[in-house]
Amino acid sequence: MTRADFIQFGAMIHGVGGTTDGWRHPDVDPSASTNIEFYMKKAQTAEKGLFSFIFIADGLFISEKSIPHFLNRFEPITILSALASVTKNIGLVGTFSTSFTEPFTISRQLMSLDHISGGRAGWNLVTSPQEGAARNHSKSNLPEHTERYEIAQEHLDVVRGLWNSWEHDAFIHNKKTGQFFDQAKLHRLNHKGKYFQVEGPLNIGRSKQGEPVVFQAGSSETGRQFAAKNADAIFTHSNSLEETKAFYADVKSRAADEGRDPSSVRIFPGISPIVADTEEEAEKKYREFAELIPIENAVTYLARFFDDYDLSVYPLDEPFPDIGDVGKNAFQSTTDRIKREAKARNLTLREVAQEMAFPRTLFIGTPERVASLIETWFNAEAADGFIVGSDIPGTLDAFVEKVIPILQERGLYRQDYRGGTLRENLGLGIPQHQSVLHSSHH
């Protein structure tokens, strides 16, 4: 298997979005996070754009300070099951935690979704970093970082073991002889580990794609190692081309060290493209959104990087002030970059504060510009594909209608779906049943 021939995309559907004040935009439906129509429309738009999958993020704890989307939203397995019935080819990926679920339940839910959708299910495996999540699951505290990954490894091994309970042709349904299944093709797990004791077998068989695709998003040392060993696909951030390229090379070489074919691991940085017919229009879309964050909050946020220096004494709409070396000890590289950018682009204090509070994406501008950036990242081996966020209304539609055709013209993007399963559309093979892999040891 070689590197994917085509760039691939996943669409993150995130209700009212990932910011504190985005819901106040006139075009945003403030109930989007629990509006099934909103999710269906987004999923269908992504499918029209031949995206490989849609992605539903999740969390297990909120407080009064959480962003609006977190306060009131769908749980992934139910919304993905609903979306399965209004889509045909697009993958359905959801976040589930290994710290607060039973492997039997997760393996069953995901395999059910895989059957409902005809082989389109994916699991974004997380270990849940919040103390509050422990308190919502009858646990007094959260296991520490390394232990959470130990639990995750055993949890995933059990889930994959359960997915191998039945061989793909175990159910023979012979009405004449009355034989419903072939007993030799049923395997009981009998797992007894440090964290889980699971007998099995699972009460649902293999799916059209064998088993769901496993995604992971660890960027810590432990997280990268875990992802390189276990994941079919990996999510990451896209702060800069150099940084993302380094992450890509690092994870692929770790996968090779684990004895895996590095090209069987797909890497997806997250981007939030803002596309418009002119640079000015794209900039205006960005500003409209950035301006929703109260300017006082944005200036206070910016001041954090400058030792909480009082920036409110400076006029907002004049060039960014010269404040000397304030903040040098705490965030030197960040403050240097802020000052450099402000000078080079002649930004006002207001603009600098807005860009820090609602980061300005690299992927902004005309369709040609955004398509070329995507091409550059793909060719530079920083990505096999991208997770596309679309907090700003209309941005997913614009991307599908204007950027996708350019990528198709350049021979970088498919003209049609390869098949109906998520594995086919990611260019990944169907995993062999474990009985085949282990038969040489019997």
From Swiss-Prot:
GO terms for molecular function: monooxygenase activity; oxidoreductase activity, acting on paired donors, with incorporation or reduction of molecular oxygen. It holds the Pfam family Bac_luciferase. Pathway: Amino-acid metabolism. Disruption phenotype: Reduced growth with methionine or methionine sulfoxide as unique source of sulfur. FMN binds at D58, T95, H145, Y149, S219, S220. Involved in a cysteine salvage pathway from S-alkylcysteine. Catalyzes the C-S bond cleavage in N-acetyl-S-benzyl-L-cysteine sulfoxide leading to N-acetyl-S-hydroxy-L-cysteine and benzaldehyde. This pathway is likely important in the catabolism of alkylated cysteine generated by proteolysis of alkylated glutathione formed in the detoxification of a wide range of electrophiles. Has much less efficient activity with N-acetyl-S-methyl-L-cysteine sulfoxide as substrate. Homodimer. This is N-acetyl-S-alkylcysteine sulfoxide monooxygenase.
